[in-house]
Design a protein with these regions (language model features):
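Short intrinsically disordered terminal tails
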Residues: 1-2, 88-91
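Basic/aromatic-rich interaction segments and small domains that mediate binding to polyanionic partners
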Residues: 3-85
Length: 91
């Protein structure tokens, strides 16, 4: 993946399950602090082979991780998360 920078749109690997509404999905993805779960609109997701990706915007680039914002409603965060760079895919 090319060098990542602030405001780049990326995909973050996630697990997808049905949500409460037809256009919403429950997702879980790994962060540096452990997994987080929440609801996102179906339009924020794409499937590449067997892998699901949720759209995220890079807010900060650190040596070991990325700070990203994921649009949605999460149980333990406001959508900001620190993820390992290996979980990021070019959008």
């Amino acid at each position: 993946m090319p060098e990542m920078k602030v405001r780049d749109v990326i995909g973050v690997e996630c697990i997808v399950q049905p949500g409460p509404f037809s256009d919403e999905r429950l997702i879980t993805f790994d962060t540096t602090d452990g997994p987080i779960s929440g609801f996102v609109q179906e339009a924020e997701l794409r499937q590449v082979g067997k892998t699901w990706l949720v759209r995220a915007v890079i807010m900060a680039v650190r040596d070991d991780f990325l700070e990203v914002r994921v649009r949605g409603s999460f149980f333990t965060t406001n959508g900001l998360a620190n993820i390992q760079k290996r979980h990021a895919v070019a959008a």
